[in-house]
């Protein structure tokens, strides 16, 4: 009976969240065709699936959700359940289906994430949120993608013919969940690195995507969660990024839980790790992304 309890708790939470938010639209990032696409199958076409707050619950912020999966898949429990939780708190959530290895390599993934931020910004009026309150959350390899979006962005391309490309790709905040960060260190995740960069990537490319080396004073603030028991993506990834944020003077909040395996998602059934969503909500209020 005992092993059923976490599953039951997750089911009950999912029912509650679903009553407060529903999936609505699927947005193709490049309606005219994805640059660099190898075909027209679903895996070749990055999209955003929209989860809106219930009527009267919109708090005027948005978040892009990047599931993990080692850059070779997209974990279901880091997908819809995450978006529904954020929507239940008043954020408009957009789940990013980004391109994956080994069919695709860098920069396809960050191109998708940057385009996602721009696209969400272009939808601010339609969905009723502030274009300066757009965050990104990523889990594991999705955390690497989110941290890449937060350190490899641009202000927009003024001469672009596509109006979306004229918008900034900088997220206003990051939520990094047991993230892959330090590609150029012994703490990196070899599977994510291989799917992202191939077997023998140039050293300079690896270093440029070891995102603790890319933090500046202009990097957006971050909320970071990891566990000391994570043997898949070592906690040093979160520690190195937090140290870089501190050195750059960028607001950052780290929650390092003693217990917990890799890939817990919302953490339903884990009495400690399951506290992170509430802590994140408090942080979003303190940072002014949600009303207090």
What does each model-found stretch correspond to?
Residues 74-76, 81-82, 96-131, 270-275:
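Catalytic nucleophile-loop/oxyanion-hole region of alpha/beta-hydrolase
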Residues 224-226, 230:
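Short beta-strand/loop motif that positions the catalytic acidic residue
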Residues 115-188, 206-207, 211:
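Primarily recognizes the serine-hydrolase "nucleophile elbow" in alpha/beta-hydrolase
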Residues 40, 51, 225, 235-292:
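C-terminal catalytic histidine-bearing segment of alpha/beta-hydrolase fold enzymes
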Residues 67-72, 228:
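Active-site glycine-rich loops that stabilize anionic/oxyanionic intermediates
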Residues 59-68:
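Short beta-strand element of the alpha/beta-hydrolase
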Residues 46, 160-164, 199-214, 219-220:
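Active-site nucleophile elbow and catalytic-triad environment of alpha/beta-hydrolase enzymes
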Residues 23-57:
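N-terminal cap/lid segment of alpha/beta-hydrolase-fold proteins
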């Amino acid at each position: 009976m005992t092993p059923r309890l976490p599953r039951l708790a997750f089911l009950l939470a999912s029912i509650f969240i679903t009553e407060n938010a529903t999936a609505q639209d699927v947005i193709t990032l490049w309606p005219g065709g994805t640059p660099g696409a190898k075909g027209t199958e679903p895996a070749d076409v990055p999209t955003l699936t929209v989860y809106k707050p219930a009527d009267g619950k919109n708090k005027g912020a948005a978040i892009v959700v990047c599931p993990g999966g080692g850059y070779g898949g997209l974990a279901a429990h880091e997908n819809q359940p995450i978006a529904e939780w954020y929507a239940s708190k008043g954020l408009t959530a957009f789940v990013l289906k980004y391109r994956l290895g080994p069919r695709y390599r860098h920069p396809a993934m960050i191109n998708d994430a940057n385009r996602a931020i721009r696209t969400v910004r272009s939808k601010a009026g339609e969905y009723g949120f502030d274009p300066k309150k757009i965050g990104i959350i990523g889990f594991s390899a999705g955390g690497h993608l989110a941290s890449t979006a937060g350190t490899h962005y641009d202000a927009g391309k003024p001469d672009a013919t596509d109006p979306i490309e004229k918008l900034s790709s900088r997220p206003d905040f990051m939520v990094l969940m047991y993230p892959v960060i330090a590609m150029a260190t012994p703490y990196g995740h070899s599977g994510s690195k291989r799917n992202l960069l191939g077997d023998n990537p140039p050293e300079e490319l690896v270093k440029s995507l070891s995102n603790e080396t890319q933090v500046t004073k202009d990097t957006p603030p971050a909320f970071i969660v990891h566990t000391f028991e994570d043997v898949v993506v070592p906690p040093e990834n979160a520690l190195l990024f937090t140290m870089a944020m501190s050195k750059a003077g960028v607001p950052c909040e780290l929650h390092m839980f003693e217990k917990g395996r890799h890939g817990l998602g919302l953490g339903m059934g884990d009495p400690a790790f399951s506290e992170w969503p509430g802590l994140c909500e408090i942080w979003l209020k303190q940072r002014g992304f949600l009303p207090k």
